[in-house]
């Protein structure tokens, strides 16, 4: 698409996590679209690998995450202090060879598109330590300097001597402070510092843009809403229905279109506690499949399942829990569900709603924050704070086949507003302003 290819650096902060996050999905999709625009993609990781002078050992060590060095408690504390003191000097990133000698197909679905990989051991934590002491983002200095950095998350790092763009997905730590563990003072300090030093900000919805202006005080002309996109391979998206049905039954022992689905972290923001109460009260005749790793306050969110006695036993029989499934199987489970339930308290975008719509699965979601903007008229909207409303929504979704068919039809149309081509064009227009 572009006449003069450049190199754009993105961070691998969330990409290195073994279990997926929404920001990791964002970063992977971003890397693919940068490549499709015609630019080269460089990814900065912070693996604790052996940055040997031997290229082969450096490549092997980078991918051998289980063998990477992790200091003990006191060693880690001393190390963080030393790097905090050296903060103003910045950090050097070294190239990681990617020759193909290491077989990476095992985790191919977690890898971004990339042309180059850089690594600076523990760079993200070290930058946080330095920022606490100095109040300045640490400079990162790769040997082959990219032309621009697009950080996928607010972090105290900058690419020295080049434009720096930061994606701020939402203001949840400040909007709903009781739903996250973030140090709110440190978070606000970082956002305000980035407002003074960043070249530009990206966000993912008009709702989030308003929050950045109203809460963080960032000037609207310094924020571009690119929205997000989902890139689901055709082989998964177009898999025959009978094959989807067999895989759903074999993997989860569930019938095709005979279960409801939620996926996401088990944390207060996702509202899983009210969802479980509403689902159990609805007495619908299909099970609920919950996919998600237990996070902060998960015990509180899952207390209806963890209670003792007959009530807890009955609830556990109706709710199937899985901590994590790989992306290809997640796509199959979305396609096989009767409906997707996503009554989150607050979302900067709401990727699960878009993924479900793209796959033709009816969606029940919140009528708050960005979700009305993303789902439009293609979802059954409920008040996420009203358990009775969620309960009635579940009953309606399960009982009304005509409604499900209509939501599926509308969802496929609505999802096209966030097609990769549209997302790519918005990114291209943004990057042209800084390259």
Locate each region found by the language model.
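Carbohydrate transferase catalytic cores enriched for Leloir-type hexosyltransferases
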Residues: 1-435
């Amino acid at each position: 698409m572009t006449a003069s290819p450049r190199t754009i650096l993105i961070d691998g902060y969330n990409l290195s996590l073994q279990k997926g996050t929404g920001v990791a999905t964002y970063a992977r999709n971003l890397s693919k679209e940068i490549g499709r625009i015609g630019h080269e993609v460089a990814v900065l990781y912070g693996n604790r690998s052996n940055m040997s002078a031997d290229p082969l050992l450096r490549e092997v060590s980078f991918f051998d995450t289980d063998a990477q060095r992790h200091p003990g408690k006191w060693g880690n504390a001393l190390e963080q202090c030393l790097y905090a003191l050296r903060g103003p000097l910045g950090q050097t990133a070294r190239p990681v060879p990617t020759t193909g000698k290491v077989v990476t197909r095992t985790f191919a679905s977690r890898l971004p598109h990339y042309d180059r990989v850089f690594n600076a051991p523990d760079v993200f934590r070290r930058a946080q330590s330095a920022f606490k002491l100095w109040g300045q983002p640490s400079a990162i200095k790769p040997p082959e300097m990219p032309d621009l950095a697009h950080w996928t998350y607010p972090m105290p790092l900058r690419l020295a001597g080049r434009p720096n763009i930061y994606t701020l997905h939402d203001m949840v730590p400040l909007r709903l402070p009781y739903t996250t563990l973030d140090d709110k003072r440190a978070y606000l300090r970082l956002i305000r510092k980035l407002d003074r030093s960043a070249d530009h900000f990206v966000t993912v919805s008009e709702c989030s843009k308003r929050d950045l202006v109203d809460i963080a005080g960032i000037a609207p002309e310094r924020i571009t809403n690119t929205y997000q996109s989902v890139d689901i391979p055709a082989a998964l998206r177009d898999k025959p229905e009978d094959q989807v049905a067999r895989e759903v039954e074999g993997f989860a022992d569930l019938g095709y279109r005979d279960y409801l689905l939620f996926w996401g972290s088990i944390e207060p923001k996702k509202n899983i506690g009210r969802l479980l109460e509403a689902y159990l009260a609805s007495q619908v005749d299909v099970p609920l499949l919950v996919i998600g790793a237990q996070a902060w306050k998960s015990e509180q969110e899952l207390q209806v399942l963890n209670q003792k006695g007959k009530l807890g036993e009955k609830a556990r029989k109706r709710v199937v829990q899985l901590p994590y499934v790989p992306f290809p199987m997640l796509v199959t489970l979305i396609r096989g569900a009767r409906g997707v339930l996503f009554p989150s308290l607050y979302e900067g975008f709401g990727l699960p709603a878009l993924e479900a719509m793209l796959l033709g699965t009816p969606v029940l979601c919140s009528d708050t924050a960005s979700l009305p903007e993303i789902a439009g008229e293609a979802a059954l909207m409920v008040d996420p704070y009203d358990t009775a409303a969620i309960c009635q929504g579940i009953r309606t979704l399960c009982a009304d086949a005509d409604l499900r068919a209509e939501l599926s039809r509308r969802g496929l149309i609505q999802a096209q507003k966030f097609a990769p081509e549209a997302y790519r064009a918005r990114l291209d227009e943004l990057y042209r302003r800084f390259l």
